[in-house]
Amino acid sequence: MKSPRFRHSQKYIGSKPYYGYYENDHYIVSWCRGHLLELKNPEEMDPKYKLFQLEHLPLIFQPSYKVIQENAEQLQILVKLLQRPDVDHAVNICDADREGELIYREVYEYAGVNKKQSRVYKSSFEAAELEAALNRLESASKYDGLAYSAKARQYLDYLLGMNITRGCTTKLAQNKFLLSSGRVQMCLLHEIRQRELAIENYREQSYYHLQLITDLGLKPVMKTEDQVLNPSPLKSLGENLKDQYLTVEDFKEGTRKQNPKLLYNLTDLYKDAHAQLQINAETAKKHIQNLYEEGFITYPRSSSRHLPTEQVDRVKGVMQALAKSRYSLLVQSVDIDAIDIKHKTFDDDLVSSHFAIIPTTKQYQEEGRPEIEKQLYSLVVKRFVGNFMRPAVYLVRDVSLIDAMGNTYQIKESVLREKGFLEVFQEEVKEESVETFKVPILQKGQELQIYDFELQESKTKKPALHTESSILTFMETAGRKIDDEHLKELMKGKRIGTVATEAAFIPVLHEKNFIDIEKGKIITTPIGRAFIEQFPVQQIKDPLYTAEMEGMIHRIEKNEMSYENFIAQTNAFVQKITQEIIRIPDTVSYNLIETWKKQIEVCQCPCGNGIILDRGKFFGCSNHPNCNKGLPKRVKEKTIPTAQVKKLFEENKTDIIKGFKSNGKEFSAYLAFVNGEVSFNLPSVEELSLGQCPKCQKGKILNRKTFFGCSEYQNGCDFMLPAKIKGKKLSDSQIKKLVNNHVTDFINGFSGEKGEFTAAIRLKTDLSICFEFPTTDDRTVGKCPLCQSRVIIGKTNYLCEQYKRGCDFIVSGMILEKRITASQIKKLLEKNMTDTVKGFVSKKTGKSFDAKLTYDSTQKRVTFIYEKKK
């Protein structure tokens, strides 16, 4: 078992600590730190494999293990304990999953012993549960299928990864750089590229619905099987139907329930952590694992959203424990006594090895805990408690009508009758509802006269670039994306990768320079695009294949497929893959290498004889070992932007970089070369200053993340400005204007009761702040190039005050995902050209680019002026 888990239990068991284990009269307890052994690389089994050569492929051998050196000491402790003559029984209490089983079996087999073996397979390690499990041990042989499935997955990934990497590095990269990948990585890279291609090929289309206007004020909409792209037939139909009648074909009134969200599985928890806490899955994983190991939540690496029926009493116990915590008010919305096996959460058929993630009865003390961990625990608790609240109940009226030509029309209306869980979780309202029904009770055969019609125009939706959250969804539901219904059924329950490993794949692809992540959007790099497009084995890219492999591994776990059969199929497939890679034309290799060279070049090295290259985990000189200049890609938990690396090597100093971390605290600094070594230069208060403090007149106003405050706060100055006002985060530049000029520019995006609004913030003489709302003169940014009237700032556009009254001048405030500032529009109107605006995102490629804007008075639209590449 893991050492943190036992340390939290030892006070109950009363064991004495020894170096690397605990012991009492009945038990010896020791632990692993993840895997203590790993698979050998080919060159460690035969030196001839040190060189990557095509004639070596395919490489097919039985896995052979080596000791992970940093864990060698603990492994030897375990081996000696297992080999002790007085030890006659080994109990596996590692994680209740494939990896936990494999970690134990690797050590046991390495020790070379033959002793009685048992298993504790629990989703929680609360002390009472652990003690009960030790009193009711299961036979280790019951989990042989699980062990073989773990070995099968390990063998599959080992063999495929080794042969794909060596084959592609040798054939595609000509051994000039490493092209490392595996089955899941290739599948995900392919999906990311396919989404980019869908965006590039997207063409927006309008489609139309016919809405009739009838007596009783009702507006039924015509039902169509497909999107209607041509409005003319609908318009003709609408004209013909005027003064005719619709007949009520069916009227239904009933209730519809909206249930609370199901309990968390790991994928859902990762996605909410990404959406609500703005953290990636890899970061969330560390804190979730810590919550589990310390006994605050149940086993997290679960794909289930349900609980077995035997957990009813446990749920009640957890609710009662939470009722004594800071979540007591939340728990009051649950009728604990009414929880029973009839609740939708309890379903034995929908729980496999592990049930959903829920809190335990152990009280979580927030003091001293990491902020992210606290927020993740809160997500788990709120989802758990909300799941057992009453559903929301809507009263629904649904009317189906028919015209004289047999076309069908529909009206639906809902009234929220019982709020249920929506009383607490208001953000989860899914459907529009009205206070009272406008649709009256209608009788079948009743006629409604048609007075007029409207054509409703809608636009097809452009696909969005993938985010980490959407990739997690793709991994979980890959089978359900297939159109064929039979294949959908076959793929049910299968996925890409496992919940235990899904957090790692996006960071790995990013680390290998196959993808970039810009503002949360995932895009392929030039080398990532070239690699996935030229990789010849379609099966490896196909989610169906990857999920089928997971399905076969699952069948081994259930003893429905033999390990030997799986190995034979894997070996045959590897033979096929290597042959396809070997047949790749040499011209493909040349183009890929040229793409790689362009991608990794950053700037000239100061040594004068080399180029600074992006080497993956670090930047270094191409003239190595003659030049040792370099920089790690991540410094103090901050990934250094390539633009700043370029600046460092060209100018010896970066700009101020925010987001370095030391002892859990963020700080800003320059990176600079001092005597040839990279060092931190902390910015002075003057450099960070946004202006002189208007209160004490001595200190400087500094950005403190959640507020702006005076540098003299320790000497008694309490002047402070919030970082966010009415939902709008204020920029350093606007705070600088507020402090120095006592008023900001007009800022868009404040949130009020009536929606978003624009205002300036003024610092009054008593140092309080207030809003100033723009007059027409304030909103004027210049003269219209078409009619010479005033151009004013609208809600979402810059437009002529005569717009729709004879003038067509209008410019969107958001162009290709980039907000256009009023100052740039002023320059556009004065000089017919803005400055270079950075960060437009191409509709065709999804890539960002920089350009100036100009206004074409003939075509009456803005156009781009691209800077010539030097």
Curated annotation (Swiss-Prot):
The keyword DNA damage does not apply. Residues 143-578 form the Topo IA-type catalytic domain. Residues 180-185 are annotated as: Interaction with DNA. SUPFAM superfamilies: Prokaryotic type I DNA topoisomerase. Signal peptide: none annotated. Keywords: DNA-binding, Isomerase, Metal-binding, Plasmid, Repeat, Topoisomerase, Virulence, Zinc, Zinc-finger. InterPro entries: Topo_IA, Topo_IA_2, Topo_IA_AS, Topo_IA_cen, Topo_IA_cen_sub1, Topo_IA_cen_sub2, Topo_IA_cen_sub3, Topo_IA_core_domain. The active site is at Y299. One of its GO terms (molecular function) is DNA binding. The keyword Transcription regulation does not apply. It catalyses: ATP-independent breakage of single-stranded DNA, followed by passage and rejoining. The record marks H35, R153, D157, R301 as: Interaction with DNA. A zinc finger (C4-type) spans 603-627, 693-717, 784-807. PROSITE patterns: TOPO_IA_1 (PS00396), TOPO_IA_2 (PS52039), TOPRIM (PS50880). Releases the supercoiling and torsional tension of DNA, which is introduced during the DNA replication and transcription, by transiently cleaving and rejoining one strand of the DNA duplex. Introduces a single-strand break via transesterification at a target site in duplex DNA. The scissile phosphodiester is attacked by the catalytic tyrosine of the enzyme, resulting in the formation of a DNA-(5'-phosphotyrosyl)-enzyme intermediate and the expulsion of a 3'-OH DNA strand. The free DNA strand then undergoes passage around the unbroken strand, thus removing DNA supercoils. Belongs to the type IA topoisomerase family. Monomer. This is DNA topoisomerase 1. It comes from Bacillus anthracis.
